[in-house]
Amino acid sequence: MPRAKTGIVRRRRHKKVLKRAKGFWGSRSKQYRNAFQTLLNAATYEYRDRRNKKRDFRRLWIQRINAGARLHGMNYSTFINGLKRANIDLNRKVLADIAAREPEAFKALVDASRNARQ
């Protein structure tokens, strides 16, 4: 009887890869080699997109702040500059949330920004 050297080890490794590839289309979820190659590509996309997510959200927050500021006759850059002069230290995530959910509070921030610029 021949000696089995990698039987259980290989099976476990393949099962782990195929488990991670669940939900992929066609042979990419059934065959080890295709699944492994697809997972390598998926890992590069994951790595890249974890970094891109930070940029995307910052861009979204800036758009929301700009839209809220323009409703009150001011653009984004002058609004942020006025907040800095007024020593109001709120990050863009919080400002975007206030602009979307609490228009009265955002109007008060716009007024404070406008007063600090004059």
From Swiss-Prot:
GO terms for cellular component: cytosolic large ribosomal subunit. Signal peptide: none annotated. Transmembrane segments: none annotated. GO terms for molecular function: rRNA binding; structural constituent of ribosome. It comes from the Bacteria. Keywords: Ribonucleoprotein, Ribosomal protein, RNA-binding, rRNA-binding. SUPFAM superfamilies: Ribosomal protein L20. One of its GO terms (biological process) is translation. It holds the Pfam family Ribosomal_L20. Binds directly to 23S rRNA, probably serving to organize its structure. Belongs to the bacterial ribosomal protein bL20 family. Part of the 50S ribosomal subunit. Contacts proteins L13 and L21. This is Large ribosomal subunit protein bL20. It comes from Deinococcus radiodurans (strain ATCC 13939 / DSM 20539 / JCM 16871 / CCUG 27074 / LMG 4051 / NBRC 15346 / NCIMB 9279 / VKM B-1422 / R1). The lineage of its organism: Bacteria, Thermotogati, Deinococcota, Deinococci, Deinococcales.
